[in-house]
From Swiss-Prot:
Organism name: Caulobacter vibrioides (strain ATCC 19089 / CIP 103742 / CB 15)
InterPro entries with a match to the protein in the record: GlnE, GlnE_rpt_dom, NT_sf, PII_UdlTrfase/GS_AdlTrfase
Gene name per UniProt: glnE
Top EC class of this enzyme: transferase
Protein name (Swiss-Prot/TrEMBL): Bifunctional glutamine synthetase adenylyltransferase/adenylyl-removing enzyme
Coiled coil: none
Keyword Transferase attributed: yes
Adenylyl transferase, as annotated region: 486-986
Pfam families found in the cross-reference section: GlnD_UR_UTase (PF08335), GlnE (PF03710)
MF annotations from Gene Ontology: [glutamate-ammonia-ligase] adenylyltransferase activity; [glutamine synthetase]-adenylyl-L-tyrosine phosphorylase activity; ATP binding; magnesium ion binding
GO biological process: regulation of glutamine family amino acid metabolic process
Residue ranges of the region described as Adenylyl removase: 1-482
């Protein structure tokens, strides 16, 4: 019997199927079984036979209804395990549906669902609704696949059922709250089960366009003063529990299945609001931070359950938000962005059925909906005829008004119907909430069969052509405007759920957690941060978001760049000015994102103090680097001076660091700028420290100076340099004591040194400044922290070792209590350096010292620019040795290494070629060192850094590619090492 029936099933074309549907419209009420046509071929006869036998076991005498229609049912059950399961589970279900008029059967299902509202038992209500859902699903699928119902009838049946069960579920939820004493009674009539509370259907639910396995989108709102809350209970808590009850009733899976998945995320700001919201709070949200995609979503909004009058008043109040009569250019551009976030591909790009996302993919349903809704938002404020909630009705209205050509309207209408039909069939196979055609040919054949096509190649070609046609027409909308996608694909952040194509784009861009990035950006679009709280701020961010993601990708470290930008962006007090700057100066914005990726200290500065970016607004920012002439604080306020110094340091270091990252300043200028900043801070804090010591211990009759050594002294500082300092003092009278505490000169100036060291190094609420090292003073840690002038002269005349004299070549007086004492200190330093000394002994000491360093602190590899052979230490030793060797004969003395090498070459005091090679290596290593110190943590491996950083490093090194930099650096270091040995060993 089964084999005979299946063999008699003949494949029908799509045209004959449509004809059968049209015939169905004309028929009087009759049995569904008599009106069915086969939807396509029987792909799996064995599956159909198994379904037949299982149904027959349960149907009994009613199997005659099934036999009569089996020719039309076999293709369905052969392709859809889900539908076969519905028919098997209840033996009477399929015969009952086949034996009745589909319209009458639907009416009976809806009436039964409505009646559940009065069911006294909660669990019984849940079970009945699930059984009715099974009836509805089988009825709808057979009526659709059999050509009896068209798309409107299918989606209408699904939506009307959703409304009925939502009403019943709401009544059951209210009963639960009444039983616990939180509500006084269950309402009835137009006020609904809970007077003051209503459910707003959104999306396809709102437009009577539900798909087969759709969830239902609705929002729950309530007027607290009208909700019949019992004494001692809060309206908010009750409303939230009602929302939770709805979830249990509708979407919780039981042995009988589920009714509908529910989605409450279309309410205002769902990540930070309860599932049920007061009406006033919702209205405030839409009036202040409502987005254009939310306006589009509310085009389809209607009251599906609850207090009809309250709901109608709410929707009426939203009309000015949805339909704006006056839109400025920026607002129109922001509406366009809903469409422009989707990547527009060339029309000759292949679009295939295999794995196609019929809803969100290129050429899919969303593109048709956006095509319609964006134009509705722009035009509907002045043209009420365009406000239809239904996609196809609105498309026809746009065509009638001349905004869409009749040809495009007709083409998109048919494509929309076909896409929805395909979507339904993909879902009917297993009741999956999927919108994709299967990747597998075997599985895709099932969809094709349910669509009336037995040839997969023909099916795929037809689907591909349709997708391509939709995408082509969609791409022409607002053509020529700025794209808000990426070359990697779509970047859609509208709505409340992740867009699959956007997640794929973010993954291609290198983000390790696309979902987190998408959620963060959606939060910014929702106005969660001050920068996007205003409408203008959100409009600007819509344009900035794709540029941010592209710039983060370009760094090669997208996660770091995005995370640090997020820290910064979230702390802005407003966003219009800075976003406008970023959009107006894209290269500057890309630079800032590079800083975020590669310079954690600078990124932290921007995050903690976003006003640091104000410097970028200064037109002189990329001009000569200038340091303020005078410290901007009162030296009499020690604590205030410490905080002010840290603010100045942070701002100035940021300016200098950005110049390093941008490659717009010479490394020598950078080193000098960092040193001049240190000079300014020392020169401002030393008087403050002196005033503080005098406040505590009283004034002392004497003079004091601060001497910088090391890189601070030579003006070769980097972003991470510490301060090598020494304090020199002299008492007017060795027997003098401080005015209040009777401190001796040694105690007074030791206290001053300690106070200054603390001012320069201790953390405060404004951060830190420098690490301070006093070990280069005479006798190092064994000697007093402050050095008397006499002890200094004696030590460097009688006791200083060669390495200490080498260090002294970089000594520079950066502050003194009087000009006279500054000159006196400078004279003592010069005198110590210009004393006669034996060349050979000095050279031997230098060689021994360098060898000791190589044993105890060897270089760590090619990128150790300091200690590796031929690195900065070799070059500095060579320059310092030559200065020390020739100082007694009035040779040049320069603190800066580069200047010293140049002066020595000009004086002819060593082989010019060797000195030139040392100077060239020093310049290269300085260029690289400045960038590395700004960007990387200590010990970082340059080789594993992103390509974008390597490109910056190559640029700093004067080559076009990183692969050319390593041999250039190796050659420079080899030449520097040879020159060092030639100079020192003679």
């Amino acid at each position: 019997m089964v084999t005979t029936v299946i063999s008699n099933v003949k494949r029908q074309s799509r045209a004959s199927l449509v004809g059968k549907r049209n015939a169905g419209h004309r028929s009087a009420m009759s049995k569904l079984a008599d009106r069915l046509a086969p939807c396509g071929p029987v792909l799996d006869p064995k599956a159909a036979e198994r379904a037949y036998e299982a149904i027959a076991k349960r149907a009994g005498e009613a199997m005659g209804q099934v036999d009569a229609a089996w020719g039309s049912l076999a293709p369905v059950f052969a392709a859809s395990p889900y539908l076969a399961g519905l028919a098997r589970r209840d033996g009477k279900r399929l015969p009952r549906i086949l034996g009745g008029d589909p319209g009458e059967t639907l009416a009976a299902i809806l009436a039964a669902a409505e009646a559940v509202a009065a069911e006294p038992d909660f669990e019984t209500a849940r079970r009945v609704l699930r059984e009715l859902k099974a009836d509805l699903h089988l009825l709808t699928a057979i009526s659709d696949l059999g050509g009896v119902w068209d798309l409107d009838q299918v989606t209408g049946a699904l939506t009307r059922f959703a409304d009925a069960v939502l009403h019943a579920a709401l009544a059951q939820a209210v009963r639960q709250e009444v039983s616990r004493g939180a509500l006084t009674h269950v309402g009835d009539g137009s006020a609904g089960p809970a007077p003051g509370l209503f459910c707003v259907a959104m999306g396809k639910h709102g437009a009577f366009e539900l798909n087969y396995s759709s969830d239902i989108d609705f929002s729950i709102f309530y007027a607290p003063e009208k909700l019949p809350v019992a004494e001692g209970h809060e309206p908010q808590a009750v409303a939230v529990r009602i929302a939770n009850h709805l979830g249990r009733i509708l979407q919780e899976r039981t042995g009988d299945g589920y009714v509908f998945r529910i989605d409450l995320r279309l309410r205002p700001d769902p990540s930070s609001t309860p599932p049920a919201m007061p009406v006033d709070a919702a209205m405030d949200y839409y009036e202040s931070v409502g987005q254009n995609w939310e306006r589009a979503a509310h085009i389809k909004a209607r009251i599906a359950a609850g207090d009809a009058a309250e709901g109608a008043a709410f929707l009426e109040g939203l009309q000015p938000f949805i339909w704006r009569r006056n839109l400025d250019f920026a607002a129109i551009a922001d509406i366009h962005s809903i469409k422009r976030q989707i990547h527009t591909y060339k029309v000759d790009d292949r679009l295939t059925a295999k794995g196609a996302d019929l809803k969100l993919g290129r050429g899919g349903i969303r593109e048709i909906e956006f095509f319609v809704q964006t134009q509705q938002l722009i035009l509907g404020g002045r043209q009420p005829d365009l406000r239809s909630p239904r996609t196809l009705d609105a498309l026809q209205a746009l065509a009638a008004a001349g905004h869409v050509t009749p040809e495009d309207a007709a083409w998109l209408t048919q494509a929309y119907k076909d896409l929805r039909a395909l979507e339904h069939r993909a879902q009917m196979i297993a009741d999956d909430q999927t919108h994709k055609l299967p990747e597998s040919d075997v599985e895709r054949k099932k969809v094709a069969a349910l669509w009336g096509e037995g040839n997969l190649r023909v099916f795929d070609a037809a689907v591909g052509k349709m997708l391509k046609g939709v995408n082509l027409r969609y791409g022409r909308l607002f053509a020529g405007e700025e794209a808000l996608s990426s070359r990697f694909g779509s970047l859609v952040f509208t709505g409340v759920e992740d867009d699959p194509e956007t997640l794929a784009t973010l993954k291609r861009m290198g983000f390790s957690s696309p979902e987190r990035v998408a959620a963060t950006i959606r939060g910014w679009h929702h106005g969660h941060i001050a920068a996007t709280r205003t409408e203008r701020g959100r409009e600007l961010f819509t344009r900035l978001a794709p540029r941010l993601l592209d710039a983060a990708n370009a760094t090669g470290a997208p996660d770091q760049a995005f995370n640090r930008f997020s820290d910064f962006f979230s702390r802005l007090s407003s966003g219009v000015q800075i976003q406008s700057l970023f959009l107006a100066q894209p290269r500057l914005f890309e630079l800032i994102v590079e800083v975020m990726a590669f310079a954690p200290r600078l990124a932290a500065t921007m995050a903690k103090r976003p006003t640091a970016l104000d410097a970028l607004l200064d037109p002189t920012f990329f001009g000569p680097i200038e340091t303020p002439a005078i410290a901007p604080w009162d030296p009499e306020d020690f604590e205030g001076a410490m905080d002010a110094a840290r603010r100045l340091f942070r701002d100035q270091s940021f300016r200098i660091g950005v110049r390093v990252m941008s490659g717009t300043a010479d490394a020598r200028d950078i080193g000098r700028a960092f040193a001049e900043l240190a000079d300014l801070i020392i020169g401002g804090l030393a008087p403050a420290a002196l005033a503080e010591v005098e406040r505590i211990g009283g004034a002392f009759p004497g003079q004091v100076a601060v001497v910088a050594l090391g890189k601070a002294g030579s003006r070769e500082m980097t972003a991470k340099s510490d301060l090598d300092l020494m304090t020199l003092y002299v008492a007017d009278d060795p027997r003098s004591m401080s005015a209040l505490k009777d401190w001796s000169a040694e105690v007074f100036y030791a206290r001053l040194t300690q106070r200054l060291t603390s001012a320069l190094s201790a953390p405060t609420g404004e951060g830190t400044l420098y690490e301070v090292d006093l070990k280069l003073r005479p006798s190092g840690t064994k000697g007093p922290v402050a050095v008397s002038f006499a002890a200094f002269e004696h030590y460097y005349e009688r006791e200083a070792e060669t390495w200490e004299l080498l260090a002294l070549t970089r000594a520079r007086v950066v502050w003194a209590s009087s000009p006279d004492f500054k000159a006196r200190a400078e004279g003592a330093i010069a005198a110590a350096l210009r004393r006669p000394r034996a060349w050979k002994k000095t050279a031997a000491d230098v060689i021994e010292m360098r060898q000791l360093m190589e044993r105890e602190r060897p270089g760590k590899g090619d990128w150790d620019l300091k200690l590796d052979p031929g690195g900065l230490v070799d070059i500095e030793f060579a320059a310092q040795f030559l200065q020390l060797a020739h100082a007694a004969a009035d040779g040049p003395l320069r603190q800066n290494t580069g200047e010293a090498l140049a002066a020595l070459r000009e004086a002819g005091l060593a082989d010019a070629g060797a000195l030139s090679r040392l100077e060239a290596a020093w310049r290269l290593e300085q260029d690289l060192s400045q960038l590395i110190k700004v960007a990387l943590e200590d010990g970082a491996d340059v080789e594993v850094e992103p390509k974008a950083f390597k490109a910056l490093l190559a640029k700093a090194g004067g080559v076009t590619q990183f692969k050319s930099l390593k041999p250039k650096l190796a050659k420079a270091k080899a030449e520097a090492r040879a020159a060092y040995e030639a100079v020192v060993k003679g």
